[in-house]
Amino acid sequence: MEQFGVRNPAIELDSIGLGAAASVRYNLLESHLYEEAIRRREADLTAHGALRALTGQHTGRSPKDKFVVRNAVTEDQIWWDNNKPMSPEHFALLHKDMLAHVHGKDLFVQDLIGGADHDYALPTRVVTEFAWHSLFIRNLLIRPERSALESFAPKLTIIDLPSFRADPERHGCRTETVIACDLVNGIVLIGGTSYAGEMKKSVFTVLNYLLPERGVMPMHCSANVGPEGDAAIFFGLSGTGKTTLSADPTRTLIGDDEHGWGENGIFNFEGGCYAKTIRLSAEAEPEIYETTRRFGTVLENVVLDEHGVPDLDDGSLTENTRSAYPLDFIPNASESGMTGHPETIIMLTADAFGVMPPIARLTPEQAMYHFLSGYTAKVAGTEKGVVEPEATFSTCFGAPFMPRHPTEYGNLLKELIARHGAGCWLVNTGWTGGAYGTGRRMPIKATRALLAAALKGDLDKAEFRIDPNFGFAVPVAVEGVDSAILDPRSTWADGQAYDAQAAKLVQMFVSNFAKFEDHVDGNVRDAAPGLRAAAE
């Protein structure tokens, strides 16, 4: 086996059973990965210098094909209602077969870090058969100093082989696609999918398992900080606006998707961003748009015209087109990936029913209720089979990535909010004037103006009304924002139709939360939307 590149000679791939590979290239830089990806016809060079790759049939995550090894340690730690179990025996067979599958192949290795706070960092080795996957994960995770690579010792190893096909009967999985996580031994196996986001979310899943035991709250959120050190976090599922809204030229970006909240404050799990690019424009999102035109960026499933120019309006391959780039491609990004404790917590939802206001103030109890509920819409393309938005509840705003029971994360969040006095807001980036199909998407300018008012403290002086359906406080007027959209009922042509839709959503909240009621105190239960009306 030929081996190239900077690495720790004590932990080369033959030491973990991958010695049958023809060659291994360790920690290649961007230019070399470009060369390999283009030479191997894995990807195309765009007119502006980015690398474009296509992922075939899998243009989003495959959550139904993700498994966690169930053993004596994880038996009582994992929320098995939400995580599919795989036996240690099936995992061992899968591992053995994937090791055999690399025979004669060229492999690429990146040694990276998950977690900007050194106290909680997870050294991660990612082994891929595609050069573009190696560039993708190099962009997304934190890159150690080159001098540190010779002594690098991973605590997590990810093996990603898209050409491998799992055998459901032999490997205890569902299809030929598999994402299998051995959380105790720090191994993740990915096969049968080229979608690069599986690697990133596997690191997130492992951190979400490890960190709560150390008193750290792992979060599916973006984060930024103002010039006065006023940090903010933005919870939300894919496509609800985490990346867009946290890329604010007046504030320093900490990260766009995954963070921890520990003793030292907020820290990014990653060193890059994975932004949705469908219908991205230079006018609305100039900083993110500019990343699509840079050397080093990976464009995933973006259509190119005959001149190699990306057409960001073309969703013919998928609505889930993406740009993966290092965090320092954003002009005002944090170099450290860390900041202090947040003063403001934003919970983003894309309300497909069009009945929620664009912003609402939450009490600490309401914040925990809405965190555990995780109401939003699955937005087209982020998961296989989702073609248009549909209402869903994804607890902790990231159920697919949360191995432990939601109340474990919810109680941690509640404790941290109480300790540090953060203000909490619910922001709807979804629909107004009607449900999806008849209404329109909330104007991003209005959302930005409302967020700015909340972050600056301007809303503290505003007049509020209590929403009759959801019980939270909604500002009556905000400077620079059309007051009509602050009252969602007034934006509907038919007020009675709004009332019926709102009542339907309230009942969905109540029904969904039933599974958590025995795990929370009475104050949190009483924070339910329309609780009295629902009980009557």
Curated annotation (Swiss-Prot):
Cross-referenced Pfam families: PEPCK_ATP (PF01293)
Protein's UniProt keywords contain Cell membrane: no
Documented EC number(s): 4.1.1.49
Ligand binding (Mn(2+)): 201, 220, 257
BP term (GO), one: gluconeogenesis
HAMAP family from the UniProt entry: PEPCK_ATP
Protein name stated in the entry: Phosphoenolpyruvate carboxykinase (ATP)
Species of the source: Rhizobium rhizogenes (strain K84 / ATCC BAA-868)
